[in-house]
């Protein structure tokens, strides 16, 4: 039935629940490399990386995306020798390239080692840990020994085992549930949100979608502005991004202008000796409307919210620049970057 779900409780009893509307939000799980299984001891997922019993002497992270770098950064700061193996020539695919390059430079200074343009062929467990075999861009074969290998190459939606086929719900080629603009599936009373539908697998995206779908079911006009959903890498320093990247604007032939401001010139960052990184704001060349922003540095995940509000209300970089920011705060770097869009930064 499309109006009833069956669940198994902790006592292994089946419970049937009826409802006029059903929302599927079963999340996602880590994926591995084909032919390689997680044992969560020597070959681990991001879930296993949260519960290691001791600090590994050497950890290899397969994948240079958000989650792999977050986990690698944590274990590096705890004392592990961390090596990142990435198939592409840069980390954090999809991120503004200038930020990505600065990010890798900072992580290298912290001692994390990077092996770029390496394709993983096999991962085999050994007595002491595991051996990762790769082929680099020149066709050379390489073997990397480690105590633990963290595979962080993506996640997949949890849509298997739900008996969705009995309802006729349509999935796409990535096993995500197809929905319309109000999160409704092809079945009139079943909706889906979060990691099981298209879009970035982010908790705050799912939360906003959950609110929107509840509003829609209640007869209101819930919606999510996907252009203003931030992404944050919780490393040290943090990295945050929202809106368009410079590469996306170039590809779309959009005329834009750039404002940048370094935390080296921010008094709060200097005072706490955490002044690496910068704020980058992209604005439309003609209208000055903020199109995107990218931050690497202290409290980047907090600072990006200001840009999100500005973009939600269609603000210009001048609107941000004319807003008084308290001194001394990290947020002054955002104001200065906005001033820099028109080459008016004060402390650059």
Named regions from a protein language model:
Residues 12-21, 139-148, 186:
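Core beta-strand elements of the Rossmann-like FAD/NAD(P) dinucleotide-binding domain
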Residues 39-55, 142-218, 223:
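FAD-site-proximal beta/loop scaffold in flavoenzymes
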Residues 2-42:
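Glycine/serine-rich phosphate-binding loop and adjoining beta1-alpha1 elements at the start
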Residues 50-51, 56-60, 66-142, 199-207, ...:
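Rossmann-like dinucleotide-binding cores of NAD(P)H-dependent redox enzymes
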């Amino acid at each position: 039935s499309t109006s009833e779900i069956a669940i198994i409780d902790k006592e292994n009893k089946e419970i049937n629940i009826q409802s006029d509307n059903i929302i599927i939000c079963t999340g996602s799980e880590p994926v591995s490399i084909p032919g390689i299984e997680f044992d969560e001891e020597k070959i681990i997922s991001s879930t296993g990386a949260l519960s290691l019993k001791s600090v590994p002497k050497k950890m290899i992270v397969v994948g240079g995306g958000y989650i792999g770098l977050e986990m690698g950064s944590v274990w590096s700061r705890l004392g592990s020798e961390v090596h990142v193996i990435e198939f592409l020539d840069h980390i954090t695919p999809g991120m503004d390239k200038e930020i990505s390059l600065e990010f890798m430079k900072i992580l290298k200074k912290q001692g994390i080692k990077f092996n770029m343009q390496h394709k993983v062929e096999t991962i085999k467990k050994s007595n002491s840990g595991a051996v990762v075999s790769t082929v680099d861009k020149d066709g050379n074969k390489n073997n990397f020994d480690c105590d633990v290998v963290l595979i962080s190459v993506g996640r997949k939606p949890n849509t298997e085992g739900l008996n969705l086929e009995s309802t006729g719900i349509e999935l796409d080629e990535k096993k995500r549930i197809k929905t319309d603009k109000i999160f409704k599936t092809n079945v009139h009373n079943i909706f889906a949100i979060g990691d099981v539908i298209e879009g970035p697998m982010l908790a705050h995206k799912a939360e906003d979608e959950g609110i929107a779908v509840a509003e829609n079911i209640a007869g209101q006009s819930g919606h999510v502005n996907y252009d203003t959903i931030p992404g944050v890498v919780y490393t040290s320093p943090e990295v945050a991004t929202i809106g368009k990247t410079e590469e996306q604007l170039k590809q779309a032939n959009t005329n834009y202008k750039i404002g940048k401001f370094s935390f080296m010139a921010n008094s709060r960052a200097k005072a706490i000796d955490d002044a690496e990184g910068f704020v980058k704001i992209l604005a439309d060349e003609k209208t000055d409307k903020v199109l995107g922003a990218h931050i690497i540095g202290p409290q980047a995940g907090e600072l990006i919210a200001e840009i999100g509000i500005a973009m939600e209300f269609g603000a210009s970089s001048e609107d941000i620049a004319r807003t008084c920011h308290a001194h001394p705060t990290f947020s002054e770097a955002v104001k200065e970057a906005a001033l820099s869009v028109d080459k008016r930064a004060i402390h650059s």
